[in-house]
Amino acid sequence: MSEKKHIMTYEGVKKLEDELEYLKTVKRKEITEKIKVALGYGDLSENSEYDEAKNEQAFTEGRIIQLENMLKNAVVVDESEISTDIVTVGSIVKVMDFDFDEEVEYSIVGSAEADPMNFKISNESPVGEGLMGKKVGDVVEIEVPGGTTKFEVLGIRR
């Protein structure tokens, strides 16, 4: 079975590379130091500092593996090839959100770099998937967990 490809922008790849570098160089050293200090407390059977440090180490190593896998399977979107005619990964799309009667601008990104609080939505999310392939002037109704929402595409840019 082949690994899932992660569609990403250059910005998204850079962000993951920076996180990976931080975890490998800074975080690993911090955790190693915490473990050394905790070992100095003696009896490991009731040493919560040691347990906490080992749990943090396991989580960090798991995240390193996850990031390495995502980067290994990244398919980077060439910004120069992003269409301004239709919504694709890498597009910045301005829409009219009829539910809130307001204009909103979303960046369509791969799932690995989605950040909805900053209006970066995954092409695999209900709204992202619903907007993919749409053109300026298209009106689309999208099924979301809270029901159906309606958007009109007002503009598309890189």
From Swiss-Prot:
Source taxon at top rank: Bacteria
Nucleotidyltransferase recorded as keyword: no
Keyword presence, Transcription regulation: yes
GO MF annotation: an example: DNA binding
Coiled-coil spans in chain: 47-74
One record GO biological process: DNA-templated transcription elongation
NCBIfam families attached to this UniProt entry: greA (TIGR01462), PRK00226.1-2 (NF001261), PRK00226.1-4 (NF001263)
Protein's name in the database: Transcription elongation factor GreA
Species: Clostridium perfringens (strain 13 / Type A)
Phylogenetic lineage: Bacteria, Bacillati, Bacillota, Clostridia, Eubacteriales
